[in-house]
Swiss-Prot record:
InterPro entries: Periplasmic_diS_OxRdtase_DsbE, Redoxin, Thioredoxin-like_sf, Thioredoxin_CS, Thioredoxin_domain, Thioredoxin_ResA/DsbE_sf. The chain crosses the membrane at residues 5-25. One of its GO terms (molecular function) is disulfide oxidoreductase activity. Belongs to the thioredoxin family. DsbE subfamily. Involved in disulfide bond formation. Catalyzes a late, reductive step in the assembly of periplasmic c-type cytochromes, probably the reduction of disulfide bonds of the apocytochrome c to allow covalent linkage with the heme. Possible subunit of a heme lyase. Keywords: Cell inner membrane, Cell membrane, Cytochrome c-type biogenesis, Disulfide bond, Membrane, Redox-active center, Transmembrane, Transmembrane helix. NCBIfam families: dsbE (TIGR00385), PRK15412.1 (NF011941). This is Thiol:disulfide interchange protein DsbE. The gene is dsbE1. It is found in: Cell inner membrane.
Length: 185
């Protein structure tokens, strides 16, 4: 009996190690744990009425995302360290003419406005989702997340995690180019 009790920690360790190795093998075969499928892919952006982050009292609806050209909807917050890491790249994309709309998620308005002044504002428009309701409707797990929305307001892609050059070039840019061409026709 004592021998079995002594082997229990070893058995638990081996089970944890096996689970870890199994997940690492899946990742090596291309199973990306950050690739979270969205139930909204292929569907219109949910209806919303949100206040401008920078202009209190000015409200926008989903139509602001359906202006005939694709747009990136970037979910961010000042409490999110990864959002800070991706922010410089968003500034670069914006400078290249990529239209990015910011969705400030469950955040303090004054802190968010100060953050944009300090780090630069890549957003053509900043929306305040202080209660997180649009985030909930979009199925947001946390910040940052980025949605590619085509010119008709259809969600075409969702990326959970920071948007960086690798993600842009391999995942989003091909789709951006495709939907930009479609919008130009």
């Amino acid at each position: 009996m004592k021998r079995n009790v002594l082997l229990l920690p070893l058995l638990i360790f081996l089970l944890i190690a096996a689970a870890l190795l199994w997940q690492l093998a899946r990742n090596a075969q291309g199973d990306d744990p950050t690739n979270l499928e969205s139930a909204l892919t292929g569907k219109p952006v949910p209806a919303f009425r949100l206040e401008s982050l920078e202009t209190p009292g000015q409200y926008y609806q989903a139509e602001v995302l359906t202006q005939g050209k694709p747009v990136l909807l970037n979910v961010w917050a000042t409490w999110c360290p990864t959002c800070r890491a991706e922010h410089q790249y968003l500034n670069q994309l914006s400078a290249q003419g990529i239209r990015v709309v910011g969705l400030n998620y469950k955040d303090d308005r004054a802190k968010a406005v100060a953050w944009l002044k300090e780090l630069g504002n890549p957003y053509a428009l900043s929306l305040s989702d202080s209660d997180g309701m649009l985030g909930l409707d979009l199925g947001v797990y946390g910040a940052p997340e980025t949605f590619l929305i085509d010119g008709r307001g259809i969600i075409r892609y969702r990326h959970a995690g920071d948007l960086n050059a690798r993600v842009w070039e391999s995942e989003l840019k091909p789709l951006w180019d495709r939907y930009s061409r479609e919008a130009a026709q």
